[in-house]
Amino acid sequence: YEELAGIVDPDLSAYDKLLFFNHELFYMIETTIDVNLLASLYSSQLITKDKRSLLESDRYYFTWLTDTISGAIESGEFKNTSTPQELLKIYAMYERALLYDWALCKGNYSLTEYSDKLLPHVLDQFVEGF
């Protein structure tokens, strides 16, 4: 995550940063991570009695997303009808849902291409307001 945040153009809008970040992240996952490993990670998160690492708010993933979304709300790029935390939850749920479905389907479709088609619809709602 930190590597991606370091290469994203700081002059991009938050909308475009999120599109870029998601595209690059999902491409990396699709091309370098074994789908069975991803399935194992997700299943272990459901049954663990300990910390659920995918939900740890101090992860760099959440820090970067919170900063990006907060900045977009403050600048008026995203409508302020939702809090940064609410939009962060929606965005993170979106990514987890796609990753879960991709793993469930054994990676039989392009995760990157599918997300490239769907994510703009989610982000449009951030702009228009929920």
Task: Enumerate the language-model features and the residues they cover.
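Secondary-structure edge/capping motif, primarily at the C-terminal ends of alpha-helices
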Residues: 4-7, 36-45, 102-106
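Short hydrophobic/aromatic-rich motifs at helix boundaries and adjacent loops
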Residues: 10-12, 37-42, 72, 91-94
